[in-house]
Amino acid sequence: MKDLGGLMKQAQAMQQKLADAQARLAELTVEGTSGGGMVTVTLRGNGELAKVVLDESLIEPGEGEVIADLIVAAHADAKKKLDAQQAQLMQEAAGPMAGMMGGLPGMKF
C-alpha cells in the first residue's frame, strides 16, 4: 500500500504541474513572420490569431493576393513556434512520466 500512496502523490504532483503548465500556455504569445518581416502575426497560447502587422509597402493596389499568401505563411510560422513551445512546456510539466503519457488523447510530448 505504501507504493500506491506514493504513486497517488506523484500523480497529484504531476496533475498540479500540468495545470500550472496549462496556465502558462494560456498566457503565451508567439510571433510568426513572412516576406522578410513584411508580415508579422501574433498568436495566443490557444492558437487564436491576436494581431496582424503589415509593412506599409504591401498596401498598394493589386497586392491583395500577395498579402493574403504572406499572412497565411506568417500564421504557419507562428503556429509552428507555438506548437514547439507548448510541447516543451508540457514535457517539462510531465517530467519523467511524459513517455508514459505520450499516447493519451490531448497530450502532446
From Swiss-Prot:
It comes from the Bacteria. GO terms for molecular function: DNA binding. GO terms for cellular component: bacterial nucleoid; cytosol. It is found in: Cytoplasm, Nucleoid. Keywords: Cytoplasm, DNA-binding. Signal peptide: none annotated. Pfam families: YbaB_DNA_bd. The keyword Hydrolase does not apply. Binds to DNA and alters its conformation. May be involved in regulation of gene expression, nucleoid organization and DNA protection. Belongs to the YbaB/EbfC family. NCBIfam families: DNA_YbaB_EbfC, PRK14625.1. Homodimer. This is Nucleoid-associated protein Caul_4574. It comes from Caulobacter sp. (strain K31). The lineage of its organism: Bacteria, Pseudomonadati, Pseudomonadota, Alphaproteobacteria, Caulobacterales.
